[in-house]
Amino acid sequence: MTDLRTAPVPGLRADDHVRGADDAPLVLFYGDLACPACALAHERLRSAPVRVVFRHFALKAKHPRALALAHAAEAAAAQGAFWKLCDGVYADQGRLDDPHLWARCEALGLDLERFDADRRGPAAAARVRRDVTDALRAGATGTPTVWIGPGGAELLDTMVTFGIREARRIGPPTDGWARKGSTYEH
């Protein structure tokens, strides 16, 4: 019989992209730099009092620029600019093509020749492939995928709990939302 359980979420690695206080709660974020939902999650996590670990879950079938942007982020990381590049890409989802990417890298002061060689090199491809493989093995099915804490508690339960709490805080819907049984439709 085949074991269909997912593998555990890999723990923190020395080469992970990490931002936030060492003593803050750990959030593992598998994201796609071309994903608008990831951009929203990125902005929310950026302002939260958490320690974020970013790993690539580049879904080229859904976002054609996903792999190119993931490789670019790794090339920027080689020059100490991973988070700056990600922040810029997520803040401007309408400009993901190469001319805008190059302008962004130039504005960050990156060595453009090195950046180009690194983004096309085997290290960036291997890193992105490892992250994507780990995400799939751990059960990720889309982006963004977020796990909380070292045990890798999947965020779905947390999102549902948060959604219920926020719905209670906000109150009944207004502005065109109509109640249909126990749900609301717009």
Residue ranges and their predicted role:
Residues 3, 17, 53, 166-167, ...:
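Intrinsically disordered, low-complexity sequence elements enriched in Ser/Thr/Gly/Pro
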Residues 26-31, 37-47, 106-186:
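C-terminal cap of thioredoxin/glutaredoxin-like
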Residues 1-11, 181, 185-186:
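N-terminal targeting signals for export/organelle localization
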Residues 28-106, 116, 175-177, 181-184:
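Structural alpha/beta surface segment adjacent to cysteine/selenocysteine redox centers
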Residues 3, 12-15, 101, 134:
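A residue-level detector for conformationally permissive "hinge/kink" positions
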Residues 2-3, 58-59, 129-131:
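Short secondary-structure boundary micro-motifs
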Residues 2-4, 80, 96, 110, ...:
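Short coil/turn linker and secondary-structure boundary residues
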Residues 7-26:
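A short beta-strand-turn-helix
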